[in-house]
Amino acid sequence: MSHLSYSEILKNIENGNIIADGVKPEQIKDQSIDVNLGRYIFIREESVKFSFKFFKQYLWLIFVAKRIEFKGLEYFMIELNHNKPFWAIPGMFILAYTNEFIGTVGGSNLQPSFKLKSTSARRGIQHPLAGLGEVGFFNRWCLELTFAVPVELRHGDLVGQIYFDTVIGKPSDYADKGSYQSISDLKKLKAEWQPEDILPGNIKNVL
């Protein structure tokens, strides 16, 4: 595999192999595309711990914030604000997503993957190794985040980058069998997409 450079990323956006909806020109870097934090986050209820320092936010979460249940799991659903931050504290497990719909189309032989920005990591944000995409996957990317120290989160924060590798052979289209995308039409995907789509789905590849 080899990473696409800036010129190759641009070329593949132009020819339709790379989907980069919502991406501004300045987000396209030498070997990747920068992505920003989406409007909503989901916090696993059992990962919320009492904190004297963030006592008011703790009370707000417990008594005011919207709760949802999905497949037997409880979440707080929080709308992020660009001006007023939400404090993610150590121990929290948060599902977030990118503002951008981004990835590759089936038949392109291009594999998209996500990496945390180094600045995000230095702020104390942690992201596990669940950033590998597949050929044909494009969507708003789910971000599974934990935190080493208290971190301010705002809608639109620069959080990570998507890079692209070439794949040898003829891989199948992710939309044909993937757990988190079954639509290969961008317009339809955007029209039907909702934040709850990032919550854990039915795993299809269990033996």
Language-model segments: residues:
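DUTPase catalytic domain/fold
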Residues: 1-207
